[in-house]
Amino acid sequence: MPFTLGQRWISDTESELGLGTVVAVDARTVTLLFPSTGENRLYARSDSPVTRVMFNPGDTITSHDGWQMQVEEVKEENGLLTYIGTRLDTEESGVALREVFLDSKLVFSKPQDRLFAGQIDRMDRFALRYRARKYSSEQFRMPYSGLRGQRTSLIPHQLNIAHDVGRRHAPRVLLADEVGLGKTIEAGMILHQQLLSGAAERVLIIVPETLQHQWLVEMLRRFNLRFALFDDERYAEAQHDAYNPFDTEQLVICSLDFARRSKQRLEHLCEAEWDLLVVDEAHHLVWSEDAPSREYQAIEQLAEHVPGVLLLTATPEQLGMESHFARLRLLDPNRFHDFAQFVEEQKNYRPVADAVAMLLAGNKLSNDELNMLGEMIGEQDIEPLLQAANSDSEDAQSARQELVSMLMDRHGTSRVLFRNTRNGVKGFPKRELHTIKLPLPTQYQTAIKVSGIMGARKSAEDRARDMLYPERIYQEFEGDNATWWNFDPRVEWLMGYLTSHRSQKVLVICAKAATALQLEQVLREREGIRAAVFHEGMSIIERDRAAAWFAEEDTGAQVLLCSEIGSEGRNFQFASHMVMFDLPFNPDLLEQRIGRLDRIGQAHDIQIHVPYLEKTAQSVLVRWYHEGLDAFEHTCPTGRTIYDSVYNDLINYLASPDQTEGFDDLIKNCREQHEALKAQLEQGRDRLLEIHSNGGEKAQALAESIEEQDDDTNLIAFAMNLFDIIGINQDDRGDNMIVLTPSDHMLVPDFPGLSEDGITITFDREVALAREDAQFITWEHPLIRNGLDLILSGDTGSSTISLLKNKALPVGTLLVELIYVVEAQAPKQLQLNRFLPPTPVRMLLDKNGNNLAAQVEFETFNRQLNAVNRHTGSKLVNAVQQDVHAILQLGEAQIEKSARALIDAARNEADEKLSAELSRLEALRAVNPNIRDDELTAIESNRQQVMESLDQAGWRLDALRLIVVTHQ
């Protein structure tokens, strides 16, 4: 290898040293100085791992003074190169730059530069890079992108709402599904889609204080969204880091009370430039035209500043039409400004609902009915569709569905309000109550008597709360170490029940963490019952482990003991037996408890066991819940309303459970009120809205498509390959679960999403739903997305060399495999990836420029190739450099046609889809005032920007592989 003083070389093994200069040569060794690091390296002349750096006409090079030059000619004299070309800063031509004056910090980023500089990657990295490009491009084009990554069951009505709302610009909607139908999941799905597509980057979630941790857990566990919880302490800390404390985080959860308590804090929230605001339990925002509540005004102020708003609420009609109007007014104050007008409009929707019912019934339509439909829809060319709907042809059903969609688009609040009911959604189990009346122990009787004397000045509410938990009254007098469990008959009953139902998974819920911990100790020590504990004092990871142990079929815990707060946000529908060791104070909490098991997807009827002590507040409450509200065996949408109306009477009965006079009348009145309200709700059901929210066959097809995608094995093969190359250890634990841990030889020292202790993953949705400690891996999971970013944002796998053993071709035949990427640069919120994600175009060229890619499929070809070590590869590249340059020029000439075809197709698709959406909404605007002006403006602006960005789309070489034919 001829070395000359002043020549520039690069190390094959330490490319981070930059450009080296030959500073000493003798008979056997050569010394290189690497100026960018100041280090020297001594190599053997005969076989040194270094590559000569030679640039070619067309390349851009940088001098050590920092100016750049486009090379036009290369001269060699006495082994040293001089580059002649035009300076890019002064446009001076004929400038000469000797190689000794090249910038030593030179980084080879183009694939061809890396290849010629000896920076040759392993063959498997090249294959991974191509697959990453291919799969990444395919995922963006999926119609349900953003809906597959969440750890949830594929429930059609939820997917329908999320698919519709998640793709809108700054959606402003009211999610009002009945309890247990998954409003939180729907909101999470919408957030996930908006964040993934770039439509939103900053999100604020405002919830009641008791639900903060539930939301935190749900967002992290189900959607891999890591929110920051802001309370007084966190807010004060963040004030040191930024003028506006909320600018320190992109995703924030806070309580409604926290938001409204301070004027300055509310101002900071309003100024924080959120893209989406989510408000849970929005039915608690009290409003009247004369006196809106402070809470309502706070949310109203925020809703004026935030483009997208999701309000989650209980049954809209539950608190009356005025309250319902108030929530719609938050979403669009221009549209919903007059309550009287709103009431009148609602009455006018009845004929539309009747028309939809008529179409769905499938009966022949009379001429009058056809005319009425034509008038309602108001489109000039509707006649053929009406005729098709009334025919006996195969198209009749789809024509009727299209007419239903058109009616729903044009009338009512279906664009801003989504509502599903249990009547309209199948798949819910029955609930069976088993009450167990137990005697009140003398120890408790004495403690209660003493407490009554000593606590005479306590309020009725405080006495009522005390009376619900006699074990705590006993401990107040006997001390925290008092062994109440030795005589409490509920403990004896629980042990007997568990030992006689060893094969059943049982969820036990009690109000306090201390009770759960004491019960675990008793069950373990007395009966050897395996019980996991779940309470608010545990970290999320500890709770995950407890939940996972409970979920294990054979060796897992038989019982999970949960505290009230600790169980928030967790669902255990693989269990169907529940024991309420005590009772919660209000019907909302009771429904929340039962909701841990009563979910869509529950395979068995739910058995609810309530052991209660006679002559205590528990005996009062169990009767009121069951006989007054029917709240154990059915969901109770009327519960809160009735609870508020009889609160004072109920508190008095709970505070003095021995005073039963008039209690039967109270229960009777509550039951009558419950039945009347329930009938009123049923009568007021908006069938039109339910049909729209449910999604019908379209939603079912969406769920089936995602289920099909779940079975795709490409992801598993790709992920394992990715983990291998990044350097992540994989340990198969069986049951479709794998443990990933960092190795000592990682591609990056700290891979995002992989902790030092490792993580458990699964590719199986069912396993992920049963095992909360296992992360559900999809194309949308941060682990895969971070892996794709790591590979594609750098130069991993961008240049390699392989040998093809093929005796049908002459030895030394060259092939060059080129991977071009066609892409457009644009702000993320334009969501350009819908039309033109970075798309790979593969070419396989011989020396004559023949493209063999169509005949030779990538994976088949890849299996026929053999790797070459870097040192040998560098020698081969140097030997054929001119030939490779010639083939690259042939590739550049050919790529334009393929790239232009992709760009034109993307332009046509974008123009067609965005123009159609704009035309549709403009037509609807004439008949449905729920189409917002700003939505139309945004779509028009988005269309223009998308088209401009696609006009500027281009292509670049992303990776190349040199293939040399051999017969050995």
Curated annotation (Swiss-Prot):
<keyword id="KW-0547">Nucleotide-binding</keyword>
<dbReference type="InterPro" id="IPR049730">
    <property type="entry name" value="SNF2/RAD54-like_C"/>
</dbReference>
<keyword id="KW-0067">ATP-binding</keyword>
<dbReference type="Pfam" id="PF00271">
    <property type="entry name" value="Helicase_C"/>
</dbReference>
<feature type="domain" description="Helicase ATP-binding">
    <location>
        <begin position="164"/>
        <end position="334"/>
    </location>
</feature>
<dbReference type="InterPro" id="IPR027417">
    <property type="entry name" value="P-loop_NTPase"/>
</dbReference>
<dbReference type="InterPro" id="IPR000330">
    <property type="entry name" value="SNF2_N"/>
</dbReference>
<keyword id="KW-0238">DNA-binding</keyword>
<dbReference type="InterPro" id="IPR040766">
    <property type="entry name" value="Tudor_2_RapA"/>
</dbReference>
<dbReference type="InterPro" id="IPR038718">
    <property type="entry name" value="SNF2-like_sf"/>
</dbReference>
<dbReference type="InterPro" id="IPR014001">
    <property type="entry name" value="Helicase_ATP-bd"/>
</dbReference>
<feature type="short sequence motif" description="DEAH box">
    <location>
        <begin position="280"/>
        <end position="283"/>
    </location>
</feature>
<dbReference type="GO" id="GO:0004386">
    <property type="term" value="F:helicase activity"/>
</dbReference>
<keyword id="KW-0010">Activator</keyword>
<keyword id="KW-0347">Helicase</keyword>
<dbReference type="GO" id="GO:0003682">
    <property type="term" value="F:chromatin binding"/>
</dbReference>
<dbReference type="InterPro" id="IPR001650">
    <property type="entry name" value="Helicase_C-like"/>
</dbReference>
<dbReference type="Pfam" id="PF18339">
    <property type="entry name" value="Tudor_1_RapA"/>
</dbReference>
<dbReference type="Pfam" id="PF12137">
    <property type="entry name" value="RapA_C"/>
</dbReference>
<dbReference type="GO" id="GO:0003677">
    <property type="term" value="F:DNA binding"/>
</dbReference>
<dbReference type="GO" id="GO:0045944">
    <property type="term" value="P:positive regulation of transcription by RNA polymerase II"/>
</dbReference>
<keyword id="KW-0378">Hydrolase</keyword>
<dbReference type="GO" id="GO:0005524">
    <property type="term" value="F:ATP binding"/>
</dbReference>
<dbReference type="Pfam" id="PF00176">
    <property type="entry name" value="SNF2-rel_dom"/>
</dbReference>
<comment type="function">
    <text>Transcription regulator that activates transcription by stimulating RNA polymerase (RNAP) recycling in case of stress conditions such as supercoiled DNA or high salt concentrations. Probably acts by releasing the RNAP, when it is trapped or immobilized on tightly supercoiled DNA. Does not activate transcription on linear DNA. Probably not involved in DNA repair.</text>
</comment>
<feature type="binding site">
    <location>
        <begin position="177"/>
        <end position="184"/>
    </location>
    <ligand>
        <name>ATP</name>
    </ligand>
</feature>
<keyword id="KW-0804">Transcription</keyword>
<dbReference type="InterPro" id="IPR023949">
    <property type="entry name" value="Helicase_RapA"/>
</dbReference>
<dbReference type="InterPro" id="IPR040765">
    <property type="entry name" value="Tudor_1_RapA"/>
</dbReference>
<dbReference type="GO" id="GO:0001000">
    <property type="term" value="F:bacterial-type RNA polymerase core enzyme binding"/>
</dbReference>
<dbReference type="GO" id="GO:0016887">
    <property type="term" value="F:ATP hydrolysis activity"/>
</dbReference>
<dbReference type="InterPro" id="IPR022737">
    <property type="entry name" value="RapA_C"/>
</dbReference>
<dbReference type="GO" id="GO:0005737">
    <property type="term" value="C:cytoplasm"/>
</dbReference>
<dbReference type="Pfam" id="PF18337">
    <property type="entry name" value="Tudor_RapA"/>
</dbReference>
<feature type="domain" description="Helicase C-terminal">
    <location>
        <begin position="490"/>
        <end position="662"/>
    </location>
</feature>
<keyword id="KW-0805">Transcription regulation</keyword>
<dbReference type="GO" id="GO:0045893">
    <property type="term" value="P:positive regulation of DNA-templated transcription"/>
</dbReference>
<dbReference type="GO" id="GO:0140750">
    <property type="term" value="F:nucleosome array spacer activity"/>
</dbReference>
<comment type="subunit">
    <text>Interacts with the RNAP. Has a higher affinity for the core RNAP than for the holoenzyme. Its ATPase activity is stimulated by binding to RNAP.</text>
</comment>
<dbReference type="GO" id="GO:0003676">
    <property type="term" value="F:nucleic acid binding"/>
</dbReference>
<protein>
    <recommendedName>
        <fullName>RNA polymerase-associated protein RapA</fullName>
        <ecNumber>3.6.4.-</ecNumber>
    </recommendedName>
</protein>
<comment type="similarity">
    <text>Belongs to the SNF2/RAD54 helicase family. RapA subfamily.</text>
</comment>
